[in-house]
């Protein structure tokens, strides 16, 4: 079959309707990542919550190296509250920001016990009340632990959405608003993972040639290519 590149290179990017562009992006991502895996290893909502919290300013690979020792020590909130914060900090030190993250892990474990019967809450509002849990972390847990449609925006999604002309890139909050308006709700969870994997493997921040990218080659406008070039030249 003819590749998307050949089909759409001649199409005016500005003339292409947002929904048409979104449909073509979905088709490419579905072909490339039909069953996108969740990058963070976990066994249940609690282990996912902790893993996502640890992933702030840290790679998923590093988190997956650290969490087995942490969960061997305390796989549940009940056991985690009995682990001294300093011990948690020592285990998670390779993930960075260990003082803040250790305090958050201990604190949220106590709240889960005291206020949620030891269970991770399945609402965005309750998750965001937990220490160390922001909107993105809560959204990831909602999507990947509970299957609730969510579009958490990380650095890869933020970058790709800007390159593809799906958002102006002013903030991750704006990017999330733009993407949930653009894609069908039932696709958000898969697309979140698909765009992350595409960003990591094909559309990286550095050493990226739009002409060789199966999406940027037709979706990225000349103006955005020029703007990215200027930023790199600084």
Q: Predicted segment positions?
A:
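Intrinsic-disorder-associated, low-complexity terminal segments enriched in Asp/Asn/His/Tyr and depleted
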Residues: 7-8
């Amino acid at each position: 079959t003819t590749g998307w590149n050949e089909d759409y290179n001649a199409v005016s990017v500005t003339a292409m309707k947002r929904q048409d562009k979104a449909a073509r992006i979905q088709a490419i991502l579905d072909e490339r990542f039909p069953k996108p895996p969740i990058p963070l290893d976990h066994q249940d909502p609690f282990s996912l919550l902790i893993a996502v919290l640890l992933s702030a300013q840290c790679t998923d690979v590093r988190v997956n190296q650290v969490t087995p020792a942490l969960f061997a020590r305390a796989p549940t909130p009940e056991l985690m509250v009995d682990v001294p914060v300093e011990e948690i900090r020592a285990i998670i030190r390779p993930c960075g920001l260990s003082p803040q993250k250790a305090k958050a892990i201990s604190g949220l474990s106590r709240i889960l016990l005291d206020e949620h019967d030891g269970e991770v809450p399945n609402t965005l509002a309750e998750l965001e009340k937990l220490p160390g849990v922001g909107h993105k972390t809560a959204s990831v847990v909602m999507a990947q632990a509970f299957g609730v449609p969510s579009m958490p925006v990380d650095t890869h999604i933020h970058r790709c959405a800007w390159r593809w002309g799906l958002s102006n890139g002013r903030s991750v909050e704006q990017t999330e608003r733009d993407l949930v308006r653009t894609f069908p709700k039932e696709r958000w969870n898969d697309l979140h993972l698909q765009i992350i994997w595409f960003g990591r493997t094909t559309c990286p921040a550095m050493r990226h040639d739009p002409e060789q990218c199966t999406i940027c080659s037709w979706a990225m406008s000349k103006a955005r290519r020029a703007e990215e070039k200027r930023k790199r030249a600084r």
